[in-house]
Amino acid sequence: MYILEIEHIAKRFGATQAVDDVCFKVEQGEIFGLLGPNGAGKTTSIRIMLDIFKPDHGSISILGGPMTEEKKNRIGYMPEERGLYQDISLESCLLYLASLKDIPNLEARKRLSEYLERFDLAAHKNKKVKELSKGMQQKAQLISTILHQPELVIIDEPFAALDPLNVQLVKDLLLDMRAHGTTILMSTHQMHQVEEMCDRIVLINQGKDVLYGSLDEIRRQFSGHAVDVRSKDPLPELAQIIDAIPQNGNTRLVLSENTQPQDIFIALANQNVHLEKFEIAIPSLDEIFIHVVKGSET
């Protein structure tokens, strides 16, 4: 079941085509990655999903149909531009934001107490928001996003300003939410977090969706562009190899466009190179990201 369906949306601002025929679907109960370089159209796409912007054409189905006022209370949104009130206490700020989502006061206080303890913020609840560190404010912003227990959570750069310990706290929370059926759409530049957490992704560049699918499918699609080899013999220079990168005792050979891994194996064998290891490299998401973005810009 799809909780979010984006069909051929487009949005222009003056001469700039911010979003251009973007399509993807988000399944219920998954963590979905919305990826792309700065200025790719991610934030505009999110604002179209949430009915902040109207698309020039295309359609959006969210929670089973068009956006309504009732559905807004079933969605949690954490924008990259944070929006906490700075001159009131942390507790007062979060309780006020909870009231906007129609959470009864006693229930809001109970949930808030649990989240403040989980995120090591309980001792700071009476401080003004502006007195908190950026990392603390980031955690508080996340609490405000999920306090009403939304069915769909849309978060933009959830790990910004967080140290490794707090990154793990946020990851554990998001994974717990997924385990309980919450759907999460996450936009981030931290590819290693995407690899660890996301079930599927879409990559947007220059307003277009250029990559879409599960991480396993995408890795298989891009395997074959490089091989990992290990040999005690020196590796010869081959015309079919465009780069040789040392990696933990191995060498990753990046292949030219029309070269197949077996071509390299044969070429090395013909030059009497004794191989201890030869396997097709599985690229990281960082490598795929760079390859696709550079390719779509040429």
Positions of the model-derived regions?
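ABC transporter nucleotide-binding domain
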Residues: 171-256
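Alpha-helix N-cap/helix-start and coil->helix boundary motif
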Residues: 10, 68, 91, 191, ...
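A general boundary/transition motif marking the beginning of the first structured unit of a protein
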Residues: 1, 85, 103-104, 252, ...
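ABC transporter nucleotide-binding domains
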Residues: 2-4, 11-205, 211
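Residues that scaffold the ATP/ADP-binding catalytic core of kinase and kinase-like folds
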Residues: 70, 218, 288, 292
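Short, charged/small-residue-rich alpha-helical element at the C-terminal edge
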Residues: 224-298
